[in-house]
Amino acid sequence: MLKLFSAFRKNKIWDFNGGIHPPEMKTQSNGTPLRQVPLAQRFVIPLKQHIGAEGELCVSVGDKVLRGQPLTRGRGKMLPVHAPTSGTVTAIAPHSTAHPSALAELSVIIDADGEDCWIPRDGWADYRTRSREELIERIHQFGVAGLGGAGFPTGVKLQGGGDKIETLIINAAECEPYITADDRLMQDCAAQVVEGIRILAHILQPREILIGIEDNKPQAISMLRAVLADSNDISLRVIPTKYPSGGAKQLTYILTGKQVPHGGRSSDIGVLMQNVGTAYAVKRAVIDGEPITERVVTLTGEAIARPGNVWARLGTPVRHLLNDARFCPSADQMVIMGGPLMGFTLPWLDVPVVKITNCLLAPSANELGEPQEEQSCIRCSACADACPADLLPQQLYWFSKGQQHDKATTHNIADCIECGACAWVCPSNIPLVQYFRQEKAEIAAIRQEEKRAAEAKARFEARQARLEREKAARLERHKSAAVQPAAKDKDAIAAALARVKEKQAQATQPIVIKAGERPDNSAIIAAREARKAQARAKQAELQQTNDAATVADPRKTAVEAAIARAKARKLEQQQANAEPEEQVDPRKAAVEAAIARAKARKLEQQQANAEPEEQVDPRKAAIEAAIARAKARKLEQQQANAEPEEQVDPRKAAVEAAIARAKARKLEQQQANAVPEEQVDPRKAAVEAAIARAKARKLEQQQTNAEPEEQVDPRKAAVAAAIARAQAKKAAQQKVVNED
């Protein structure tokens, strides 16, 4: 009695909350043995057929490949893919793949040559002599992934289990309607499946090995029991049919009574699960030396005249498989990859078969019924009762629809296994799984963006820290260089100090004069003369700098005078050759005369302030005075020949004459009161005298040509002329005295 009770406890099974019992529809395809499908003409092999990054390409367009030859390299979590047959690589380009949106992914396109030649195969029949690491590496490099639907790399999963796995579970439940791939594989290849299970057990060394299978597969159960008749290390557990008992968390709870923690993995509780198809692929990779190039696919549905399970090469177009099964599409025919609850509709039939493709369902219009219109949620809680993960689908629906990502995360949307039980029982025909998939994808995108932002922030902070360290190091180097001079600098400083000390010693050395000898003062005298010369040079340099800033260069002055003379000659020639009707405007001539007088005064001031050694030649000054008188006479002639209507106003001329007389008196007073040592410059006096005579003549000419009714008093004009002549004579006498 105790033994019976112990046996009952040993084979105990648990039941999970929720679940549904939809029509199984498995008899359409599980009654015929596995069969081969003729090779397609073209194969499309996506580089990514698993969870993780795609591998690195190791083939090029035009390469000849054999069946089983790697097309990519598997490093880390990157799983390689292999050629499904022999042929030629014709293209490497994006192609639509097995995805609800038919996303394009990079794929290798191979045209088959029809020979189907294998690469040399090296099987490990003695796998028990191999180490755990060698077996895991072989499984990984041969491209084995989870064939139950997740597509997680098997080698990575085994490596992560380590030594903490106590229970190895083989998932043979295959609970979704229509799918019979695992059922037929266990019926036809039970021995190979068990051999693969033993290889996994050899790697993990678990305490117990459990095979969970639903009771709706009697033929498969019989075949497994026959193979395990003489084995005590593997236990076969038959469980009630209930959807979704094939889920990883649900089957773990059914067989062990343990629940996977929220956000955790089954390995956290000492459990590792593998699919039946994965165990078979492990056997072929290790013992037969064959990479995964094909898998069992169920072809079913009322639109298929020849349903069943076939060995489909990876990369085979779906259209090719359906045509081989005598596909009879209707007007609005749909094809579902996967089961009716967890699968997705293909947008077109050129999508290739991949490692996670377990079923192609082509139902008729009567089989699935008319599509129902989505209605509003009535909060009946039927979805919550059917959820096997103990979630609240109606709340998740509202959060997903309202883009409330934080609340959806708080309500554990990540624990949803997308089994479709909630959508199956929903009376409002709401496609809840579609909302949940979209919400999970958006949350994943947000987290990925946050991760990238955090990485960018970390890189920025690291860069700032590096720049600060470099700046501190640079300042430290500069500080060290300033405090501690280099060896060259030290030598130069020492040499300079030595020279200074030597000079000081020579300067302080006493001079000894012997009797009868004269002291030698030549060195002292030379040093004194050198200092004086240096002082004079500095003073001269300073004086030249000041003169350059205030006084014009005498040579420049001479050049300007020559330019002025050239301009005067040019003007005379132009006037001499001018036509009578183009006489010079008297006002313009007066302006030019004033400009000439201003230039003459400027030149006189510059010459008067020049250094004594740079005095202008008196003869040159006399020549310039003569030029000025000639210009004055010329201006008088121009004014005399001017048109009568443009004559100067006599009153204005009288005013100018009075101003000239006042200036003459002022000049006489300045000359009379001047100190002898400050005599007027003879050149300046000569120029002023010439200017005065020119003004006098100009006034006489203006008065002579004035209109009769506006004539100035002749006596007054005569007096002014006499005064001007007297001033000129006085200036000439003063010039003679200064020259003496």
Swiss-Prot record:
Which cofactors are named for this entry? [4Fe-4S] cluster
**UniProt keywords, alphabetically:** 4Fe-4S, Cell inner membrane, Cell membrane, Electron transport, Iron, Iron-sulfur, Membrane, Metal-binding, Repeat, Translocase, Transport
Transmembrane segments in this chain: where?
Answer: none
> Annotated region Disordered: where?
627-652, 694-718
Q: Where in the cell is it found?
A: Cell inner membrane
Q: Which sites bind [4Fe-4S] cluster 2?
A: C387, C416, C419, C422
EC primary class: translocase
The protein's matches in PANTHER family, at most eight in alphabetical order, are given as: ION-TRANSLOCATING OXIDOREDUCTASE COMPLEX SUBUNIT C
What the protein does?
A: Part of a membrane-bound complex that couples electron transfer with translocation of ions across the membrane. Required to maintain the reduced state of SoxR.
Its protein name is: Ion-translocating oxidoreductase complex subunit C
